[in-house]
Amino acid sequence: MRWWRRRRPVAGKLEGLVNFRDLGGLPADGGTVRPGLLFRSDSLAYATPADAERLVHDLGLSTVIDLRGEYEVEQLGRGPLSWAGVGYYSAPIADVSGAADLVGHYVAMLTEKGPVLARTVRHLTCAGTLPAVFHCEAGCDRTGVLAAVVLGLLGVPEEAIAADYAATAAAMPAINERVAVVVDRLGLPPRPASVPVWEPQAALMIRTLELVRERWGGMEGWAREHGLSADELSALRADLVTAA
């Protein structure tokens, strides 16, 4: 295990981020996910300067992993952390094939963007990467898939992975308001009134993980197919899992 410039936890809510949370504390194979090292979030473009100050100085944040596409980043920006001396790693997993439902969309990410996701996992094992935060726009779909990959490789039970995914539901009212603005800024067609607003439900992630087991035998099988070595997976676990 390596040592990091980890500091005290962030107390209270952040000003601009509505879907930021620590993945630490979840049950994992051989212990729990180590707190204070890996976070997920909605877009850090919404962070205020005060948020950036807290993330850097309270959490000792070292790396931002951005799952948005190049056009999103160009149009919406990176926010105040882009000039805060924090490392930046671009891992775009947008632009996957259309699917009939969200589960199909998530599986498409795992297949079509598997190499990008695998490189991102590898980057987490590099010295100096942690503590890290990863995000997309809402912090739900793309972020939820990467969270499922990492947590699955750490041996977090599927029910706990699904519960973490579903925790985004509390932030959906604020996220949906933002999405309407983002859609307009990116020149995309608005959501038709006939299309219902969805919420992340645990059952969606449970089904996704079932399909991972059916296709790859589990997340480790997915990782092997995408070039991650046993040593890299061991390093990931050594860094991110602490004995119970």
Q: Each predicted region: which residue ranges?
A:
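Cys-dependent protein tyrosine phosphatase-like superfamily
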Residues: M1-V133, V145-A244
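Ser/Thr-glycine-rich phosphate-binding loops at phosphate-binding pockets of nucleotides
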Residues: A138, R142-T143
